[in-house]
Amino acid sequence: MSDTDNSAEMPARCPSPNPAPGAKQEPPNSGITISLLEIGSLPTVCYHSFPPPKNSICPVEKRGRVQKFSNLLKDVKDVLKNIAGVEEKSTVGEPFDDAYIPEDLSELNVRGVEKKNKIRFKDDLFIHFDPEREQNTMKQMLLKNQSAKNMVPKFARDLCNAEETRGFDGMLLSVKRPRNGSLHLRGEYRKLRNNMEQLLQEADHWSKQHNELSELMRSYQECQNETQETTDKDRACLQNQPNNGLSTKQKLEEQVKKLSHDTHALHLIAALLENECQVLQQRVDILKDFHLHEAGLGHEKPLQMSCEQDKKCPKLAEADKTDAFKHTTRATEGTIRKPKILRSPDVCFTKKARNNRFNARVAKKSLVGKRRTVSSFR
């Protein structure tokens, strides 16, 4: 009766949760069921610690135990199906707000996501399952219940409870995991986006600094070119200054030479003018003496004397007449016309020579006239 009661209590304690209506029914994963059975199975220590079965156990009890284990397996399969459906809902129904999901997702990508979720569920089961803790609990229960009859149903009950709690924990984890994963991914995506924004800001800042540096380099090059041009101009000016000084000195020397030449010419002209003045004064004096002499003496005697002398020396007479004629004409020209100023020194010298010759002739004539007067008085 106890076995039947236990068999009646087992399905009541292990109700399988109803699957979601929109969940996609998939064949159970054999790897997951085997792993669960291996986890839920008793360790070798427990089997060795069991007392040997008695012959008094009926085959009815064996059948009941087989049915219990089959029921447990069915419940585990249903739990796994429900967990897979919940995971699919969580992955498909909760899209990321910040992430961009393209519309043309293929079925291969969906299947890959489902496989990843199943692998994640396996990992969660293996990670969160603590075999040492369960072994300790089982050992304590085995020590408390030493009877072989009550050990199997109690172990079945504990196993059922453990499977139920494990299934519900797995469901909660599978429900919470995508949410936590989505939050984690959102946080990482936000961090990446913030990092990208910071990098873009830094790139803008660096580009601005690069532009400023390029402008500074251009201004610096322009300043260098200007300073180089000014230095070249200064050097050219310094090199040209001695040449300019020499050219100015040469110009001044040439001007001094011209001035000295002009002063020398002026001095010559002044000397010639003074000489001409003296000559003119002499001429004036001679003419006065000649007029006085002509007025005081008769015309006949001097003419006779002159005729005799002319006969004696006809050549001298003709020369004297020509000289007298020239003297009279020049005297009249000197009184009427102004004396010409000769610019060239050669002309001045020739004129001076002519004047000297004229003066010599006038002096000779004056001497000849005096001699004639003396001879006539005798």
From Swiss-Prot:
User: Could you tell me the Gene Ontology terms of the biological process aspect for this record?
Assistant: positive regulation of transcription by RNA polymerase II
The ranges of region (Disordered) come to: 1-31
Query: Where is this protein chiefly located?
Result: cytoplasm
Which segments does the entry list as coiled coil?
182-233
Where is it expressed, tissue-wise?
A: Expressed specifically in the testis and epidydimis. In the testis expressed in both germ cells and somatic cells (Sertoli and Leydig cells). Expressed in several tumor cell lines.
**Manganese: present as a keyword of the record?**
no
- Superkingdom is Eukaryota
Query: GO molecular function: any one?
Result: DNA-binding transcription factor activity, RNA polymerase II-specific
Q: Which UniProt keywords apply?
A: Coiled coil, Cytoplasm, DNA-binding, Nucleus, Phosphoprotein, Proto-oncogene, Transcription, Transcription regulation
Q: For the region Interaction with PPP1CC isoform gamma-2, give the residue spans.
A: 116-122
Please provide one cellular component term from the Gene Ontology annotations of this protein: cytoplasm
PTM comment text:
Phosphorylated by MAPK1/ERK2 and MAPK3/ERK1.
Which residue ranges does the record annotate as region Basic motif? 128-193
Q: What induces it?
A: Down-regulated by testosterone and retinoic acid.
Where, per UniProt, does this protein localize?
Cytoplasm; Nucleus
Extract the ranges annotated as region (Helix-loop-helix motif): 116-127
Keyword Lyase on this protein? Answer: no
Q: Where do the segments described as Leucine-zipper lie?
A: 252-273
Report the residues modified as Phosphoserine: 106, 207
Briefly, what is this protein's role? Answer: Transcription factor that binds to the DNA sequence 5'-CANNTG-3'(E box) and the G-box motif. Directly binds to a guanine-rich region of the PCNA promoter and up-regulates its expression which in turn induces cell transformation and tumor formation. May play an important role in the regulation of cell proliferation and differentiation during spermatogenesis.
- Whom does it interact with, and what assembly results? Interacts with PPP1CC isoform gamma-2. This interaction can prevent SPZ1 binding to the E-box and inhibits PPP1CC activity.
> Anything else the record notes?
The helix-loop-helix and basic motifs form a Spz1 specific bHLH different from the classical one.
> What is this protein's name?
Spermatogenic leucine zipper protein 1
Organism (species): Mus musculus (Mouse)
Classification from the root reads: Eukaryota, Metazoa, Chordata, Craniata, Vertebrata
Name the gene. Spz1
